[in-house]
């Protein structure tokens, strides 16, 4: 559009009426320019910052999805932009007017608004993760919750006990009267102390020594079967074995001469009496581990086997008696007494001769 200061529009000249109208409009705009600036400054100066920031926070919640959106998100962002421009104009007005106190309050409110926007962003992120998370994939705590009763909850919620500081001191001594002498040594002879006192003390040990124990006869029990005397060897060796010499004890026991009968044989010399309580032999030493040892031994399996030979081979030459069936000889266990059989060639020749006679 051509300028209003020109008298012609393109190649054609303007009409005188249009030229006059354009000049009047130019003067009016120049006259109202200051009025419009004053109106804008008044609007920016009296802008309520708290109300504007509350509106911006409401729009921020709608844009982030925390609140339902009444309009499209683009419309909400346009409204947010208009309110932000009004805040910027307010800042420019304060800067031009050099009002430092008002500008400081304005900056504090803007910082609080920005921190609230950051909190809303974090809250929106948590809500989005909560919607996308699967509750079945969250691990549950281990243990039975039902076993913990109200007492356990009270213990967890109760405050920690305050420990009092205890000072340990010696008991107070009795007050000594002025002029009273301290007590002297105890009456009587002093005890005789020596360096070898500990060596002469008797050592009390729960371990019982076998030398101090005497043989105790075992009483006869009701045995329905007669005792079996297992004496292996000739009869003359029954009484030929020397008897075991008894141990010489320092303390004489009245039943020390009784015979020890571990197999339950009948004893007709005296009645069976338990003369002392059963004793327990305790050994504090650890038992030695069992060790199995064996020397290598070579066996002659060929000599241990029993050879099966035909009956015809066992017949002597020239013996024409009728063959009498006889029982098989018992298996001989000892290989050194076993009869040496014929070798393989002789047995094979005799077997072939027998077959020729049968054919």
Swiss-Prot record:
Q: Which InterPro entries match?
A: WW_dom-bd_prot_11
Biased composition of type Basic residues is found at 245-256
Region Disordered, annotated ranges: 1-38, 235-264, 317-341
In the record, which residues are listed under signal peptide? none
What processes does the entry annotate via GO biological process terms?
Answer: RNA processing
Return any one Pfam family short name.
Answer: Wbp11
Locate the transmembrane regions by residue number. none
Q: What does this protein do?
A: Activates pre-mRNA splicing. May inhibit PP1 phosphatase activity.
Q: How is this protein named in the record?
A: WW domain-binding protein wbp-11
Taxonomic source organism:
Caenorhabditis elegans
Q: In the UniProt record, what gene is named as encoding this protein?
A: wbp-11
